[in-house]
Amino acid sequence: KFHPGGSLGRRLLCKVKDQMQTRLPITTPDTNFTDCLTIMNEGRMGVALVMENQQLKGIITDGDVRRALTANGADTLNKTAKELMTSSPKTIHENEFLAKAEDLMKEKKIHSLVVINDENNVVGLVEFSS
């Protein structure tokens, strides 16, 4: 039940860097809507990171796309990543425990966190499904 290899052990002992995805779906602020969708789809995570000059500018989630379509209808097709993204996405350090990442995602009602290193560089994404 409390075996380190079990789900509780994984949650308590595992670090974010051990579970993060490192093949990241990345777009730029001026990427058009259709290309954003393609990048999100190819990444298979339901998100795209908006990066410029190696800096994280925002994140686009499936929810952001749905809200944009609901609010703007067909005009959404003319939007860019900068207009769709959530600025200042939630981040977590790669050496934090996975349990902390899961707790943060539950608290913020989000499904993914951007993972950063000591230099604040983006190094991955970690997902949580409830």
Predicted feature locations:
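A glycine-centered beta-loop-beta connector
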Residues: 40-43, 48-64, 105, 113-129
